[in-house]
């Protein structure tokens, strides 16, 4: 069983992880474009999640959302590629640590489970969207 955290704690966790990544990238001093690239990836994820087709069955909804989630990670790695090598490694480490937090209803759980029980997790998507929005707001305040 995973931890049951409300949206405020999830937002805090995401914000701390993103702040840690931003701090590491800023320290490198060579990666000015990475901020725009990362924010573009985050905005694209938000747009995709907000505009995914309605009226699909749960299995198709989950597949669609998970495709957006994987696209976000691919986009982020691409944005970090031109930066210092350590930034990409840092992102991969943060992704792994986030997955290990085992927060019930997270996109890691939703998209990685494959156990057929993920349909009950769809209401958690709204919490995750709010969390991502809060993380973006925190990130932009840097």
Curated annotation (Swiss-Prot):
Lipid-linked residues (GPI-anchor amidated glycine): 116
Record carries keyword Cell membrane: yes
Signal peptide start and end residues: 1-27
Top-level lineage group: Eukaryota
InterPro entries, per the entry: Neuritin_fam
GO molecular function: identical protein binding
Pfam family, one: NRN1
Mode of membrane association: Lipid-anchor; GPI-anchor
Functional summary from the UniProt entry: Promotes neurite outgrowth and especially branching of neuritic processes in primary hippocampal and cortical cells.
Similarity annotation: Belongs to the neuritin family.
Protein name (Swiss-Prot/TrEMBL): Neuritin
Source lineage: Eukaryota, Metazoa, Chordata, Craniata, Vertebrata
Name of the coding gene: Nrn1
């Amino acid at each position: 069983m995973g931890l049951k955290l409300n949206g405020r704690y999830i937002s805090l966790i995401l914000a701390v992880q993103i702040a840690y990544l931003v701090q590491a990238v800023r320290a490198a001093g060579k990666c000015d474009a990475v901020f725009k690239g990362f924010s573009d990836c985050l905005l694209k994820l938000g747009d995709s999640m907000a505009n995914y087709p309605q009226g699909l069955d749960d299995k198709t909804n989950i597949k669609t959302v998970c495709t957006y989630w994987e696209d976000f990670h691919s986009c982020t790695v691409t944005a970090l590629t031109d930066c210092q090598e350590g930034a990409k490694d840092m992102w991969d480490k943060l992704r792994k640590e986030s997955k290990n937090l085992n927060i019930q209803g997270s996109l890691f759980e939703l998209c990685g489970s494959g156990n057929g029980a993920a349909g009950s997790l769809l209401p958690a998507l709204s919490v995750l969207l709010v969390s991502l929005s809060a993380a973006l707001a925190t990130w932009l305040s840097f």
